[in-house]
Amino acid sequence: MAIDYSKEIETVNSITYEEFQENFYKPQIPVKIKNLLSDSRANAKWSPKFFKRHLSDLEVGVFDNNPELLDRSQKTAPHTMRFGDYIDMIEEKPTDARLHLFNVFKHMPDLVKDFEYPDIADRILKSLPFAFIGGEGSVARLHRDMDNSNVFLTEFWGRKKVVLFSP
């Protein structure tokens, strides 16, 4: 059965706690919230150039879409490289290389001061903030989050295509 990619996800510019809970969280309907962090310092300063300037020499694990590994879960990256080289690579040309479950806050703890967690949901898990960084052509394989979490996927630069499906 083919996946129908034509269903649009509702987009709002802002939303209250009550609106989010009643219209999206409780019925488990995805929503794009355009301005949730628009006033944050993170939105103003986080960019590939910013992270390269601060983390250029950091060795990072890099995942790809090796066809021999597509049928199994990968918890350890098959490649490593300097973060600065990775940023250069994804800005230069399309690539399937990506950083997955990269805890940038471990290396730059003060980044948590650049944003506030949204007040539209209860019990936001603040101890596991991860960055998913990839350039044009990178793909996160079909997966279910291991903790069955509801997540806030926040895009700071670039574009992302996301396919959601109900279990």
Specify the residue positions occupied by each region the protein language model found:
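N-terminal accessory scaffold of Fe(II)-dependent oxygenases
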Residues: 1-167
